[in-house]
From Swiss-Prot:
GO cellular component: mitochondrion
InterPro entries: Pentatricopeptide_rpt, PPR-containing_protein, TPR-like_helical_dom_sf
Name of this chain's protein: Pentatricopeptide repeat-containing protein At1g80150, mitochondrial
Keywords on record: Mitochondrion, Repeat, Transit peptide
Sequence similarity: Belongs to the PPR family. P subfamily.
Coiled-coil region: none
Pfam family, one: PPR
Residue ranges of PPR repeats: 105-139, 140-170, 176-210, 211-245, 246-280, 281-315, 316-350, 351-381
């Protein structure tokens, strides 16, 4: 049972909704020995747009394992019914599913709980957890975490704490690291950082070891709320405890360093990552490139971009956007022009402000042909820029 006496004093329960981390395990939709879903049924479920007809079609296949065990068909149906506001149809379908043989499998019930949660039907999700024994289904920490995950979508955090405090002892469930991480994420989303830290301490008192998700969640929230000293301390504690940072952790730290205009430190982390068998991604490179531009080292930003190419990475739209935008700000319109052409030929377009800045720079340098070339590519954009935007760009020429 989770002790919350230390945590509660940090909680002020604002009305904004908390968002949890999707840690909930669901069973695989790979069913051994089953043939693929027959095309006619799949096509009908996928293409049906009328909510009532969709409901009837799925209801007609309620006992067809090829349908109900297909995760996409199940979740897509519920999602579209929720989008149409037909929560009554969703409840009827899911309640019926619970009475069938699959309702005795916890993995299937976890899916039902999460589907209710994603549809905003919190009460039904909790009732599903509370009434599992009525269908002959045993509870474990997996279904507990599913219900906790759904509660983390709900603004009533009093309910979350009551559930955390009462449900484990009532149902004989030993909560795990995932349970704590969901709670910690909820605290962080609400800005209750002292409560989040105390939850981590309670985690350790319970004999559980904080993992990389725990540390990353806390470090990210601390940096976001300008509590940098504590964030740095947690980074050091994580390393001392032998918990290896993952890609997300590195990106959180690099973003913090970039925001502080510590581009060289961010670059050092980028270089350290491969040595720890953590490969940077496009987000990592984009942040370091932007960091050097912001710190007024455009040459280093270009070097990082070139090094990224050398390692086999290809720029995406965000990296193109960063490079073109800041190259223009640095007055390097020649390279910005070349990169903008490459970007647009791939059907990727920088934002309007960046294109406008590039055109003005080219015209000012007397490179009218290059500016016209960019405008030709602008006209090929799909969907096109609005007429008013196009007129604004043309006026530059």
């Amino acid at each position: 049972m989770l002790s919350l006496r230390h945590i509660r004093r940090f909680c002020h329960f604002p009305s904004s909704a908390a968002t949890g981390i999707a840690y909930v395990s669901t069973e695989s939709n790979q069913i051994q020995g089953l043939k693929p879903l027959e095309e006619p049924a799949l096509v009908k479920l996928k293409s049906e747009r009328d909510p009532e007809k969709l409901y009837n079609l799925f209801k007609a296949n309620a006992t067809n394992r090829l349908v109900i065990e297909n995760r996409f068909a199940f979740e897509d149906t519920v999602s579209r019914l929720a989008g149409a506001g037909r929560l009554d149809f969703i409840e009827d379908l899911l309640e019926h599913q619970k009475t069938l043989p699959q309702g005795r499998r916890e993995g299937f019930i976890v899916r039902i709980i999460m589907l209710y949660g994603k549809a905003g039907m919190t009460k039904q999700a909790l009732d599903t957890f509370f009434n599992m024994d009525l269908y002959g289904c045993k509870r474990s920490v997996k279904s507990f975490n599913a219900a906790l995950q759904v509660l983390s979508f709900n603004p009533d955090l009093h309910t979350i704490w009551e559930f955390l405090h009462d449900a484990p002892s009532k149902y004989g469930i030993d909560i795990d690291a995932v349970s704590f991480n969901i709670a910690i994420k909820s605290f962080c989303e609400l800005g209750i950082l002292d409560g989040a830290y105390m939850a981590m301490r309670e985690m350790e008192k319970s004999g559980l070891t904080p993992d990389v998700v725990t540390y990353t969640t806390l470090i990210s929230a601390l940096y976001k709320h300008e509590r940098c000293v504590i964030g740095n301390g947690l980074w050091n504690l994580m390393v001392l405890k032998g918990c290896k940072p993952n890609l997300t952790t590195f990106n959180v730290r690099i973003q913090f360093l970039v925001n502080r205009r510590r581009a060289w430190d961010a670059n050092d982390l980028l270089l350290l990552m491969p040595k720890l068998q953590v490969e940077p991604d496009s987000i990592t490179y984009n942040m370091v490139i932007k960091g050097f531009f912001l710190a007024r080292f455009p040459d280093m930003a270009e070097r990082v971009y070139t090094a990224m190419h050398g390692k086999g990475y290809k720029p995406n739209l965000k990296i193109y956007q960063t490079m073109i935008h800041y190259l223009c700000k640095a007055g390097n319109f020649d390279l910005a022009y070349t990169m903008c052409k490459d970007c647009m030929r791939k059907k990727w377009y920088p934002n309007l402000d960046t294109v406008e800045m590039l055109l003005k720079g080219l015209v000012k340098k007397g490179q009218l042909d290059q500016a016209k070339s960019i405008m030709e590519l602008v006209h090929r954009r799909v969907p096109p820029f609005r007429s008013k935007q196009l007129l604004s760009l043309k006026s530059i020429l």
